[in-house]
């Protein structure tokens, strides 16, 4: 078969339910070169501060519901529905839902060029 499908219901969330949910779909999709994650952030919740300097992975975040702030060093970028941001591997980042509604994002990561 030349395609696979997956749904967040197919995998366990790696985030405490009170903060939302985070579902890694890479294995469920049998993806080899790209990671795909669905993330839900409840109001007031944050993602983990991190970068990918250790593995050279660049990331793209796409907001599909709600609004989030992505903190990048001394700057905060606000993203709303249908907005996307790409970050280089070495860029420290942290997602925050400072709004009053649940935010939902698709996170995609793969080897940098």
List the predicted regions and their residue ranges.
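Glycine- and acidic-residue-biased ligand/ion/polar-headgroup-sensing regions
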Residues: 56-73
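Short, charged/polar surface micro-motifs in flexible loops or helix N-caps
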Residues: 31-32, 42-47, 67, 111-113
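Short acidic-glycine-tyrosine-enriched beta hairpin
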Residues: 73-90
């Amino acid at each position: 078969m030349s395609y696979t499908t997956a749904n967040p219901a197919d995998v366990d969330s790696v985030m405490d339910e009170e903060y939302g949910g985070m579902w890694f779909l890479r294995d469920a999709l049998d993806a080899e070169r790209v990671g795909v994650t669905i993330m839900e952030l409840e109001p007031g919740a944050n993602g983990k501060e991190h970068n990918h300097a250790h593995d050279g992975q660049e990331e793209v975040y796409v907001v599909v519901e709600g609004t989030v702030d992505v903190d990048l060093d001394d700057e905060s970028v606000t993203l709303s529905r249908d907005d996307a941001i790409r970050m280089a591997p070495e860029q420290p980042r942290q997602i925050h839902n400072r709004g009053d509604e649940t935010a939902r994002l698709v996170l995609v990561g793969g080897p940098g060029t």
